[in-house]
Amino acid sequence: MHLVTSVEELADIIRQGGVIAYPTEAVWGLGCDPFNESAVRRILTLKSRPESKGLILVAGAQEELSPWLNLLDDKAAQRLISLNETPTSWVVPDTTITPSWVRGEHQSVAIRLSQHQPVQRLCAAFQGVIVSTSANPAGLEPAMSAKEVHQYFGCNIDAIFDAPLGDASQPSQVRDILTDNLFRA
C-alpha cells in the first residue's frame, strides 16, 4: 500500500495519468485528471462501472469551477458555490467543457465544491478539478478506510492519500442545478 501525505506528490501522480484514492466528506474516493481519458477509463475498469453513467468532478475552490460557473445564470451559480450542510454534487448542463468519457450519456456533468480540507488541498496542488467516484467495485460498499481501499484495489492504484475522512454520514447528494430537484439523497 503506497500511502502518501504530500499533496504535491499526489498532484504529480495525477498529472502523469495516475489514479489515486483519497478521503472525501463521507467515503473514500478514486480520483484522476478528468481530461486524461486513459486515467478515467482505468477508474471505470477498476470499478466495473459503465461509462454511460458518468462521473462526478470535485473542486476545492470556487476558481476551479469557473468554466462551469460561466455557463450558469447568477442564481444557479450562487447555488453551486453556496455552503451546504450536506455535501452536494450539482448536475450542470455541459456539452463543451467536460469530455464525454466523464459525462457518460449525459449532456451534463455533476460537480461538487468540497468543504473537506484534504480535498481542497489536493485540488489546489493539482490546480483544478479531479474525478470523484466512490472507492469500491460495483455492487460493494464504498471503502471507509485506506485499508479497505487496498483490499479492493491492491496495487492497481498509484497512491492512497494518507488523510482523514470527513464527518458526513452519507456520500454527497446529487441535485439538478437549474431545478434543485434531488437525484440521489
UniProtKB/Swiss-Prot annotation:
Entry's InterPro entries?
A: DHBP_synth_RibB-like_a/b_dom, Sua5-like_dom, TC-AMP_synthase, TC-AMP_synthase_SUA5
Q: Which reaction does it catalyse?
A: L-threonine + hydrogencarbonate + ATP = L-threonylcarbamoyladenylate + diphosphate + H2O
* One MF term in the entry's GO annotations: L-threonylcarbamoyladenylate synthase
- Localization terms from the record: Cytoplasm
Q: Could you say which protein family the record assigns here? A: Belongs to the SUA5 family. TsaC subfamily.
Q: What GO cellular-component annotations does this UniProt entry give? A: cytoplasm
Is Transferase given among the entry's keywords?
Answer: yes
Name listed for the protein in its UniProt record: Threonylcarbamoyl-AMP synthase
YrdC-like domain boundaries: 4-185
Under PANTHER family, the record lists: SUA5, THREONYLCARBAMOYL-AMP SYNTHASE
> What organism is the protein native to?
Marinomonas sp. (strain MWYL1)
Function in brief: Required for the formation of a threonylcarbamoyl group on adenosine at position 37 (t(6)A37) in tRNAs that read codons beginning with adenine. Catalyzes the conversion of L-threonine, HCO(3)(-)/CO(2) and ATP to give threonylcarbamoyl-AMP (TC-AMP) as the acyladenylate intermediate, with the release of diphosphate.
The UniProt keyword set, sorted, is: ATP-binding, Cytoplasm, Nucleotide-binding, Nucleotidyltransferase, Transferase, tRNA processing
Could you tell me the Gene Ontology terms of the biological process aspect for this record?
Answer: regulation of translational fidelity; tRNA threonylcarbamoyladenosine modification
Which domain of life does the protein's organism represent? Bacteria
EC no. given is: 2.7.7.87
